[in-house]
Amino acid sequence: MSVNMDELKHQVMINQFVLTAGCAADQAKQLLQAAHWQFETALSTFFQETNIPYSHHHQMMCTPANTPATPPNFPDALTMFSRLKASESFHGGGGSSSPMATSATSPPPHFPHATGSFATPSWPTAASPPGGPQQHQPQPPLWTPAPPSPTSDWPPLAPQQATSEPRAHPAMEAER
């Protein structure tokens, strides 16, 4: 009875291999037998052999379809990428967009005095949220509204900070 069970297991593996690799059943059986019925080994062998020229899948594998990984016209795409220059785009509009670019890329240097008093308490909350999620939840909402427009948001947030953390309010007022 174990022979029939082994045959059944082998037939199931062959069918699964055909569905996974998209090959013929006789090729799947040969690969699985060569790999001593180890599915992953046979599958790896199949996909490594598709690069060998005698494989009947070779033409289909080497001529990719127009997928997101292959652009429609590769030389034109290379030409467009070669024309892009990141340094010129940042320095070209540097007069009006450089403060916004620096605040978007690195907010702490843009607000060094306002973040100086909160640098120590805010980093541990980001590093260890599971430790005390109820204690650390009030701090991120106070931190996120500040960077967009500090002059208009700080006075409405100052009374909220005074009620939640009395020592945070004087530090923010002193830095302002």
Curated annotation (Swiss-Prot):
InterPro entries: UBA-like_sf, UBA_8, UBALD1/2. Residues 120-137 have a biased composition (Low complexity). Pfam families: UBA_8. Residues 166-176 have a biased composition (Basic and acidic residues). Signal peptide: none annotated. Residues 87-176 are annotated as: Disordered. Residues 138-150 have a biased composition (Pro residues). Belongs to the UBALD family. This is UBA-like domain-containing protein 1.
